[in-house]
Every structure is written in C-alpha cells, then in structure tokens.
C-alpha cells in the first residue's frame, strides 16, 4: 500500500501519523526537564504547521528524560504534573492527537516508564506502563496495567508498546487480539539494535495483520547515540515509509486501518491471528482450540522456567551498577480512570 506521499494526499479513510525523531536530551534538573517539555510542545506545533492533515504525532520513549536512566525524584513526572498538563494543552491548542513518554514517580518502588495517548481535545485516551524494561540496563518498575487499546482518530483502534516490549511477539499479539489495527512503538534504542528493530517491526505487523508505526530518539547527547529510524509497516509486513538519522525530523505516512480490518475478515492464507486459535480448521470443525504451548500454561500457573534457568548469568541489575532488589513484584494502584 502507498503512503499517500507522507499524508500529503490524504484518502477519506486514511489516518496520517507523524513520527518525531526527537534529538536526544540530557536533563538533570527540574528546569532542564521543563525546557525539554517546552521543546516537545513546540514540536507539536511544528507537526500541525508542517502537515495540516496530520492526525497523530508520536514522540519517542525518553523524549523528556533522555537516556541517563536517572531515577532522581526531582525529575520524575506525574499524570497531573505540569509536564503532562503542558503536553495535553498542546494537543488541544493545535487540534492534534499526541503520543508522549514520561518517567513516572512511583512512591511504592522504582519509577515507571510510562506513555500516554492524548486526543485532540487534550484528554488522555490511553495510559500505559512499560511491561518489559530493558534489563539489565533499565531500572524501571515492571508495568502492571496490562496492554490497553483505545479508539483513535478517524475510526482507528490504537495500541502502544515501548521499545523492548516489541521484542516479545506476545506483546504485539495482545495488541491485535484486543482489536488494535495500528500499534505504536516508541523507543530510545541505539545503533546495535538496528537490525532487530527492523525485523521485529515487520514481523509484529505481518503475524498480526496490523500496521505498525515505530520511532526512536535520534542523535547524540555526548554519551549515547540514538538512531531515529522511524518506520511504518503495512499489515503484510512491507515497509511503507522510513526515516534515517536526522534529528527532529517528523516522518509521516498515511495508514489505512479500514484495509487492516478488511484483511482480517477476508484473508484465508496467512490470516495468522485467527488461525492461531483455530488450528487445522480444514480437517476439524472450527479448528483445534486447545492450548498446546507449554510456556503459556506454565506462565499462567506462575511456573515459567527454562531448561537452562540455573545457568543464566544476568538475573538482576548488578552488571549495570544497580543493587540487588529485595522486593517482590506487587502492582501499584493508579489514580487514572478511563
């Protein structure tokens, strides 16, 4: 499917998404965090000016906080804090949907790596805490809100995952299973992950008949180098549009969720998300609907264990300078209501 020349030729059923390859910041004070927030607010305005037909502007993971992995309380955000208020107001002012990243204060443990989808009236439509922090490098609390989906612009259904989440095929499958026709993936990845980034963005799309829109931070903060690499993939796994390494570029593409829905209903061969739960339906009525996967049954029972479990070297964050944790996992209540 064509990209509509980056949304310049918008079709009646199209959803135009911009992926912002935001320059990598390095804030260590509240003032620096606020300055970076204002930069993102300015980029929301730029998105609207540069493409009047854009429906949604997506910012990468770490777009406010950079890659320092600092958990300093003075630079953590909250859902009702000034940074989130400013981002919501920007969407409302410029009548555009936005996807934003925050490191969220957690009084019961380590901060959460969280993301929001805000509509063009400034309302939070989706709130997600990263399920799979990039261990052993990242110190964030494991997410505890599942994988939500929300109604998006122009009849789309959106899901949002963060960076390392996309390396687990179960994440994209859950997004699609809950009805998402477009999955957003925001990241701070650096160059060594480039190949894995591309093939997982494509496989996540193809195996779920879902369009994916993915973007990393971009450029250098003097220590780390993020890669940009904005990428749109169609539901058949083909790349529709992609960016390079130019910081602060907004890469745009028109997606067609109506064609995703059509494929999910009408495809026979490679309708994998349906066939996963209806194995061999040519031979048996409705297909086999059991669960033949040992790892799924074990995970559900709290007994997930690899044959080489005892030999795994990295099982905490000590190799990256973090203390061995003593707390067991316990979900943290959220004040946000859908």
From Swiss-Prot:
Keywords: Hydrolase. It catalyses: formamide + H2O = formate + NH4(+). InterPro entries: Aliph_Amidase/BUP, C-N_Hydrolase, C-N_Hydrolase_sf, Formamidase. The active site is at residues 61, 130, 163. SUPFAM superfamilies: Carbon-nitrogen hydrolase. The keyword Hydrolase applies. Its EC number is 3.5.1.49. Gene3D superfamilies: Carbon-nitrogen hydrolase (3.60.110.10). PROSITE patterns: CN_HYDROLASE. The keyword Ubl conjugation does not apply. CDD domains: aliphatic_amidase. It is an enzyme of class 3 (hydrolase). GO terms for molecular function: formamidase activity; N-carbamoylputrescine amidase activity. GO terms for biological process: putrescine biosynthetic process from arginine. Pfam families: CN_hydrolase. Residues 15-257 form the CN hydrolase domain. Is an aliphatic amidase with a restricted substrate specificity, as it only hydrolyzes formamide. PANTHER family: FORMAMIDASE, NITRILASE C965.09-RELATED. Belongs to the carbon-nitrogen hydrolase superfamily. Aliphatic amidase family. HAMAP family: Formamidase (MF_01243). This is Formamidase. It comes from Pseudomonas syringae pv. tomato (strain ATCC BAA-871 / DC3000). The gene is amiF.
């Amino acid at each position: 499917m064509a990209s509509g020349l980056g949304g310049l030729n918008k079709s009646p059923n199209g959803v135009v998404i911009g992926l912002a390859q935001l320059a990598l910041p390095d804030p260590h004070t509240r003032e620096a965090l606020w300055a970076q927030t204002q930069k993102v607010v300015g980029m929301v305005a730029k998105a609207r000016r540069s493409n009047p037909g854009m429906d949604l502007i997506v910012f990468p993971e770490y777009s406010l906080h950079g890659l320092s992995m600092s958990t300093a309380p003075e630079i953590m955000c909250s859902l009702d804090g000034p940074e989130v208020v400013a981002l919501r107001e920007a969407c409302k002012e410029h009548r555009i949907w936005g996807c934003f990243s925050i490191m969220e204060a957690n009084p019961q443990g380590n901060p959460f790596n969280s993301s929001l989808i805000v509509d063009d009236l400034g309302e939070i439509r989706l709130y997600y805490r990263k399920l799979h922090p990039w261990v052993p490098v990242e110190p964030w609390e494991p997410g505890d809100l599942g994988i939500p989906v929300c109604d998006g612009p122009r009849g789309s259904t959106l899901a949002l995952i963060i960076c390392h989440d996309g390396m687990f095929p179960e994440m994209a499958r859950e997004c699609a299973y809950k009805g998402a026709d477009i999955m957003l993936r925001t990241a701070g990845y650096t160059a060594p992950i480039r190949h894995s980034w591309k093939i997982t963005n494509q496989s996540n799309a193809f195996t779920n008949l879902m369009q994916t829109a993915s973007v990393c931070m971009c450029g250098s903060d003097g220590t780390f180098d993020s890669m940009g690499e904005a990428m749109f993939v169609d539901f058949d796994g083909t790349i529709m549009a992609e960016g390079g390494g130019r910081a602060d570029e907004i890469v745009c593409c028109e997606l067609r969720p109506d064609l995703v829905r059509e494929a999910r209903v009408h495809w026979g061969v490679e309708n994998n998300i349906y066939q996963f739960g209806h194995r061999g339906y040519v031979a048996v009525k409705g297909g086999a609907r059991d669960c033949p996967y040992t790892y799924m049954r074990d995970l559900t029972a709290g007994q997930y264990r690899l044959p080489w479990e005892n030999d795994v070297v990295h099982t905490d964050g000590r190799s990256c300078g973090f203390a061995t944790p003593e707390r067991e996992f316990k979900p943290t209540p959220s004040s946000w209501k859908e």
